[in-house]
């Protein structure tokens, strides 16, 4: 039996670290369901790993729904989180609509990339009763506009923004926050 998405926040409150891996298909999900992970992520990285795109920006909602369904069919004990792909959260109402689609496909939680600029969408998703995971640091959906993959939080200004964004997302009610390519000393402060 799957735990409730609220178990992720409870783990944080208890000082536990979360363990997760990425899955894009049924057989992988079946195998990983036996590993005792906190959740599986159906990542938009499937655009590169499965579909052969150069980055995640070309992944569609249809791609995410298809792969979320496959992963959800493969688990009985592990929560499933699904990425909201690039462009799927342009407005709070669009973010809610697309989050509902991922939930209908079998996701227990959705994951959204971005900080305070995404707070209206984050709050709308959570207000609709959909559990959410934030994603800060290097944001793959912005790799084209940022000119590549770069460590975040090295400068004082970046570090302060990451901390501020994490606090805002946490206070909004996110179940967890993914930190990607965050400067190690700053990341250590989060965990």
Regions of interest found by a model, annotated:
Residues 2-191:
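Alpha/beta enzyme core
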């Amino acid at each position: 039996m799957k735990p409730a998405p609220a178990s992720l926040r409870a783990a944080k409150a208890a000082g536990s670290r979360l363990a997760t891996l990425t899955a894009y298909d049924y057989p992988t999900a079946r195998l990983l369901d036996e590993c005792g992970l906190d959740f599986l992520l159906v990542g938009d990285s499937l655009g590169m790993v499965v579909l052969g795109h150069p980055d995640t920006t070309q992944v569609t909602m249809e791609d995410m729904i298809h792969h979320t369904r496959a992963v959800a069919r493969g688990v009985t004990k592990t929560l499933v989180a699904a990425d909201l792909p690039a462009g799927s959260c342009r407005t709070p109402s669009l973010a809610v609509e697309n989050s509902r689609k991922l939930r209908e496909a079998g996701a227990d939680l959705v994951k959204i990339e971005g900080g305070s600029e995404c707070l209206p969408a984050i709050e709308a998703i959570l207000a609709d009763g959909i559990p959410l995971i934030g994603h800060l640091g290097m944001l793959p959906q912005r790799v084209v506009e940022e000119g590549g993959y770069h460590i975040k939080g090295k400068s004082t200004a970046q570090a302060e923004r990451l901390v501020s964004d994490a606090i805002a997302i946490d206070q909004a009610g996110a179940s967890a926050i993914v930190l990607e390519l965050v400067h190690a000393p700053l990341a250590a402060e989060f965990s």
